[in-house]
């Protein structure tokens, strides 16, 4: 029996209902139905595993702490087992608190280093809100990081990265060049919890169809609604190669990859940017789409006469094509090969 004819006998989900959420979008409850018997568990379990393992996010991957005391003595914390003078908590507890900060960088940013100082005289308690600077957004601002004595001043430096899943401190340490910088193990996932259940639902005279009920809790870095969309997209990308085993799928991919490479050589004038933005980019010798995405937001912001509005315009224009600043050429080619069209 041909596959196409066989699939006509399947009942495909027609309704996706967003039942409830929190105001910040960090919680969502969804129902998807009707499924043929057994497909509710299959789809629910797959979505749950992908949500918990594969949604990208941000985490602090390294830190440097220097304690300066009233008697002019100073100490750089050299390891997680070292003490921080003037801080009530031990270093392991401080690190545990730091790893619980839920934060996010600006659009398209994948790495940032932030530095700041706090004085025990002015700040008795160091909180996650102190990390909210230089475009960093914090979602649990009231989280306590450390308690400071009155005569201590701390110079702090933290590295924030974009990633997926769990990365050990040993892996993060490979990318550190400075001494007295402590690498942290990092959990990038913005998903806190996922649960699902399957209920019976009726279609016509039959009541043996599946209704999938999913609940998603996030840190706030991504909304529950966007998280389930992203998980479904990831599953689709993994299953796409299985749809057609013919050799022409490889030929088609190579053709689309070649066309995508040509698009990276396209003039930025075809992006319909404002004259001001185009002039600023021209002064930085950015003339093609490929040259534009190779720049990160920080580089462009430092350009002369390059304002916030121009940066926002460029980020918005690139995002409409699923591209972003600081994107690698390989990632851009992959995205463009998925039939993302840019008008000539």
Swiss-Prot record:
Recorded catalytic reaction(s): these are:
RNA(n) + a ribonucleoside 5'-triphosphate = RNA(n+1) + diphosphate
EC class, as a word, reads: transferase
Q: Which UniProt keywords apply?
A: DNA-directed RNA polymerase, Nucleotidyltransferase, Transcription, Transferase
What CDD domains does the annotation carry? RNAP_alpha_NTD
The record's note on its domains:
The N-terminal domain is essential for RNAP assembly and basal transcription, whereas the C-terminal domain is involved in interaction with transcriptional regulators and with upstream promoter elements.
- Gene, per the UniProt record: rpoA
Please report the name of this protein according to its UniProt entry. DNA-directed RNA polymerase subunit alpha
Return the similarity comment.
Belongs to the RNA polymerase alpha chain family.
Known function: DNA-dependent RNA polymerase catalyzes the transcription of DNA into RNA using the four ribonucleoside triphosphates as substrates.
How would you summarize the oligomeric state and partners of this protein? Homodimer. The RNAP catalytic core consists of 2 alpha, 1 beta, 1 beta' and 1 omega subunit. When a sigma factor is associated with the core the holoenzyme is formed, which can initiate transcription.
Q: Region Alpha N-terminal domain (alpha-NTD): start and end of each range? A: 1-246
**One Gene Ontology biological process:** DNA-templated transcription
Name a GO CC annotation attached to this entry: DNA-directed RNA polymerase complex
> Signal peptide position in this chain?
none
Return the annotated region ranges for Alpha C-terminal domain (alpha-CTD): 259-344
Q: Which SMART domains match?
A: RPOLD (SM00662)
Pfam families, A to Z: RNA_pol_A_bac, RNA_pol_A_CTD, RNA_pol_L
Molecular-function annotations in GO: DNA binding; DNA-directed RNA polymerase activity; protein dimerization activity
Domain of life assignment: Bacteria
Give the enzyme's EC designation: 2.7.7.6
């Amino acid at each position: 029996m041909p596959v196409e004819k066989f699939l006509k006998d399947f009942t495909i989900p027609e309704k996706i209902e967003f039942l409830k959420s929190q105001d910040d979008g960090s919680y969502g409850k969804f129902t998807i139905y009707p499924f043929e018997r057994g497909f509710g568990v299959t789809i629910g379990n797959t979505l749950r595993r992908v949500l918990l393992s594969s949604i990208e996010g941000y985490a602090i991957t390294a830190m440097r702490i220097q304690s300066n005391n009233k008697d002019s003595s100073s100490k750089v914390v050299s390891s997680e087992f070292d003490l921080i003078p003037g801080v009530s908590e031990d270093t392991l507890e401080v690190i545990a608190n730091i790893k619980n900060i839920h934060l996010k960088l600006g659009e398209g940013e994948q790495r940032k280093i932030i530095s700041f100082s706090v004085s025990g005289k002015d700040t008795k308690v160091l909180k996650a809100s102190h990390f909210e600077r230089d475009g960093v957004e914090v979602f649990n601002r009231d989280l306590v990081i450390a308690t400071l004595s009155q005569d201590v001043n701390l110079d702090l430096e933290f590295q924030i990265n974009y990633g997926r899943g769990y990365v050990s401190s040993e892996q993060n340490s490979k990318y550190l060049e400075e001494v007295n910088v402590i690498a942290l193990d990092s959990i990038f996932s913005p998903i806190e919890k996922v649960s699902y259940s399957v209920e019976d639902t009726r279609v016509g005279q039959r009541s043996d169809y599946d209704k999938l009920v999913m609940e998603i809790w996030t840190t706030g870095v991504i909304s529950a609604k966007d998280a389930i969309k992203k998980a479904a997209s990831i599953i689709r990308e993994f299953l796409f190669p299985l749809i057609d085993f013919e050799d022409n799928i490889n030929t088609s991919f190579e053709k689309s990859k070649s066309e995508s490479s040509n698009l990276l050589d396209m003039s930025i004038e075809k992006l319909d940017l404002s004259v001001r933005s185009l002039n600023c980019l021209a002064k930085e010798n950015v003339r093609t789409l490929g040259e534009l995405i190779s720049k990160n937001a920080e580089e462009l912001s430092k350009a002369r006469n390059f304002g916030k509005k121009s940066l926002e315009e460029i980020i918005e224009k690139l995002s409409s094509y699923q591209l972003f600043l600081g994107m690698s050429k390989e990632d851009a080619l992959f995205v463009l090969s998925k039939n993302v069209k840019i008008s000539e």
